[in-house]
Amino acid sequence: MKKPNLMIYVTKSSFKKMQNSNQELEWSQKLSLIRSREYLFSRGHARYFISTIKNISPLEVPLFSPPGKPPTLKNNFGFLSISHCKSGCLIGWSKFPLGVDIENINRDFLAKEILNKYYSIEERSLLNKYDLNKLKKIVLDYWLIKEASFKLRGGNLLSELKNLIVNQNNKTVLNKELLLTNRYLIKSFKDWRIAVSFDMNINITEPLICYSNFES
């Protein structure tokens, strides 16, 4: 069976022990306790996920992922993007570059403040017409889409936010400074809202979603 172009893996953040490389274990020792657990958990699940795609052991996956850096897969294993929130972890794998982001669907935050501080003039003008409940949902969606797009391209997230213009009609994001456009997908899955960004020349309607709730 031909593998799909895009697969995403979602799991709950139980922080159970996973298989990690010696290098990942060494890097984790330089992090705070919470950050170390989060790092080992996400990279361990990334190894597990890719191992199921490639039919190899998790420690054979050629993953290079220092803390704070975009993860890379060597040996033509494809592309990987990782995101986590308080309750879950999202791992995206594809044959092409991608960026992913995840957040709890009911996260409480100050939507008006985020809109006015981080979003473009065009977006503020468009979104300020909504009531608070609707506004919170759209501001959350835009944040997820923008962060996934940032992970696709790289750069500095906070400085890029106002340059990233979301177009809900054609499901694209324009970086008005770099004049680069990418596509996105956004959807709900269980307790989460998830976004995936990818290049304009890729046409995908639905990713294959894999969900894990096992204790390891």
What spans do the regions from the language model cover?
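Core catalytic alpha/beta fold that binds nucleotide/phospho-ligands
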Residues: 1-216
